[in-house]
């Protein structure tokens, strides 16, 4: 019998080994769909972004009105803009669920895959931040001013660094044009890094809900999981279409419908909802440098999780105390998200400080401690 082309052709062979004949554990749940959903989000964002970039002008004088032009005069421009803006929210929903799945089922023990995943999270956050500046509304301008200003906390070179990033003495035209450049460039860097993420994942194979070796029970990715992923695609695209057509401004700040004005500061400067937990941690520390370090560490702490794994079992499926800690982390992160959107006044300041301290204590102390306790409880 003649050899199958998909198994012999140099290029098709890579696709075949990644998407068709890939041996996959038979018991992975829908929580394993978020990786492919993130790929779909990235493709959607790149495509809609490309069409938006054809009509957008990265200039302080015309950026805001070019957005109005896209929404009013360009064929389906309103839809492209709404899908792109809400697609970012869906991107972060998927990425947070993907990370949560990784923590719960011990997928972080694939260290290279996990660390590249954390780098991907940082890249996605950077892309979303520079993208939020582009409409040049009030929150775009002041968000850019506040967040880039945190670089000034770096000792000795801080002020020079901020002015270097701004391209002047304030957030202005030079800042907008370079942010547009970064926003265009970074998604392609994310796509390339995602390939590395998959490369390392396919070196080990997927984890599964039990955390046990599944080599004795593998099935081909296609048709079983390709159809399962397609079902996930349909649900997510339907939800994105529904949000983008019926309530497109649900996630956005009304302040951003006012053109940027350096002379008028909005009453409450806050980022999009997906950054609020980190923003709450930044705000809860009175010292500027301390706040910046806490902000950075709130994400980089994910890289420490593999080193803090003290359990004898990989997955939390059979570890009740660790499950309690996991859901405490989720609840605490939701509290931080709520606090990040509130004004800086009592009782929110105190709640934010307690939640921020608890965030680090849960990850660094209580999670390893409960892992160890579970070992004792289960006589391992």
Curated annotation (Swiss-Prot):
Pfam families attached to this UniProt entry: Cytochrom_B_C, Cytochrome_B
UniProt cofactor note: Binds 2 heme b groups non-covalently.
Residues annotated as binding heme b b562: 84, 183
Entry keyword annotation includes Transmembrane: yes
PROSITE patterns given in the database record: CYTB_CTER, CYTB_NTER
Similarity comment: family membership: Belongs to the cytochrome b family.
Misc. comment: Heme 1 (or BL or b562) is low-potential and absorbs at about 562 nm, and heme 2 (or BH or b566) is high-potential and absorbs at about 566 nm.
Listed name of the protein: Cytochrome b
Organism: Typhlonectes natans (Rubber eel)
């Amino acid at each position: 019998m003649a050899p199958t082309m998909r198994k012999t052709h140099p290029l098709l062979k890579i696709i075949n080994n990644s998407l068709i004949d890939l041996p996959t554990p038979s018991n992975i749940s829908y929580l394993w769909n978020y990786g492919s959903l993130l790929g779909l989000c990235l493709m959607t964002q790149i495509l809609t972004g490309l069409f938006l970039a054809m009509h957008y002008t990265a200039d302080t004088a015309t950026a805001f009105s070019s957005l109005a032009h896209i929404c009013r005069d360009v064929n389906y421009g309103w839809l492209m803009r709404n899908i792109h803006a809400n697609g970012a929210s869906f991107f972060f929903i998927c990425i947070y669920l993907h990370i949560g799945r990784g923590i719960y089922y011990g997928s972080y023990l694939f260290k290279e895959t996990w660390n590249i995943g954390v780098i991907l999270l940082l890249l996605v956050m950077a892309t979303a931040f520079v993208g939020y500046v582009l409409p040049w509304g009030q929150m775009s301008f002041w968000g850019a001013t506040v967040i880039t200003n945190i670089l000034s906390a770096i000792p000795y070179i801080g002020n020079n660094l901020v002015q270097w990033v701004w391209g002047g003495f304030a957030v202005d035209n030079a800042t907008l044009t370079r942010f547009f450049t970064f926003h265009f460039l970074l998604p392609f860097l994310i796509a390339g890094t995602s390939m590395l993420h998959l490369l390392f994942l396919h070196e080990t194979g997927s984890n599964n809900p039990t955390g046990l070796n599944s080599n004795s029970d593998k099935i081909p990715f296609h048709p079983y999981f390709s159809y399962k992923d397609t079902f996930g695609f349909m649900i997510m695209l339907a939800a994105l279409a529904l949000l983008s057509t019926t309530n497109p401004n649900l996630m956005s700040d009304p302040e951003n419908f006012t053109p940027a004005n350096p002379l008028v500061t909005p009453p409450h400067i806050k980022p999009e909802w997906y950054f609020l937990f980190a923003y709450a941690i930044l705000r809860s520390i009175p010292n500027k440098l301390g706040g910046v370090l806490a902000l950075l560490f709130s994400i980089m702490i994910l890289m420490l999780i593999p080193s803090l794994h003290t359990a004898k079992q990989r997955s939390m499926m059979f570890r009740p105390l660790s499950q309690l800690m996991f859901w405490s982390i989720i609840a605490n992160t939701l509290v931080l998200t709520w606090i990040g959107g509130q004004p800086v006044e009592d009782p929110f300041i105190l709640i934010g400080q307690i939640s921020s301290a608890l965030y680090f204590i849960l990850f660094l102390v209580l999670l390893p401690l409960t892992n160890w306790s579970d070992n004792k409880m289960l006589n391992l």
